[in-house]
Amino acid sequence: MGCCGCSGGCGSGCGGCGSGCGGCGSSCCVPICCCKPVCCCVPACSCSSCGSCGGSKGGRGSCGGSKGDCGSCGGSKGGCGSCGCSQCSCYKPCCCSSGCGSSCCQSSCCKPCCSQSSCCKPCSCSSGCGSSCCQSSCCKPCCSQSSCCKPCCCSSGCGSSCCQSSCCKPCCSQSSCCVPICCQCKI
């Protein structure tokens, strides 16, 4: 298959393919074909234009990143954008959706956004929970889920030594949360 509409194969004679590329679908470039200085398109990349990114190894060299998709093309190719992460197999790290703190979703994993618990570590606490809550490697949507937070925050009326163990149920109002049960919790 020719590269981006260039005749004569995919060697040095191919030249620039720029606007001739026309897209990154399977009809554009095969994975092993690349026209300098244009970034090769692999079928998994859904960008409308490859643009110039200096790669010369079919989307898997300095151009394509470890996954051979859009990689280090710069964050504007492949439908993810520099922030949105709608196709996060391509970009890492991703940006958090509104309502999630900047410390969320800064790991090597990149799923659509903070609303997915498997994306973020650590996560931000929801309103009403202290900053010491949800600072572990586990991240469920937020403090309202007891399996997220360790240690958890005590509700008003419970002493500070209550609920400071690895167990965390929603709060001190549940006596099964506190080890030891240091106060008279209303249940």
UniProtKB/Swiss-Prot annotation:
Stretches the record annotates as 9 X 4 AA repeats of C-C-X-P: 28-180
UniProt Sequence repeat ranges: 28-31, 34-37, 40-43, 109-112, 119-122, 138-141, 148-151, 167-170, 177-180
Domain of life: Eukaryota
Reported tissue expression: Restricted to hair root, not detected in any other tissues. Expressed in cuticle layers of differentiating hair follicles.
One of the record's GO molecular function terms: structural constituent of skin epidermis
One GO location term (cellular component): intermediate filament
Keywords assigned: Keratin, Repeat
Family: Belongs to the KRTAP type 5 family.
Function: In the hair cortex, hair keratin intermediate filaments are embedded in an interfilamentous matrix, consisting of hair keratin-associated protein (KRTAP), which are essential for the formation of a rigid and resistant hair shaft through their extensive disulfide bond cross-linking with abundant cysteine residues of hair keratins. The matrix proteins include the high-sulfur and high-glycine-tyrosine keratins.
Record's protein name: Keratin-associated protein 5-8
Gene: KRTAP5-8
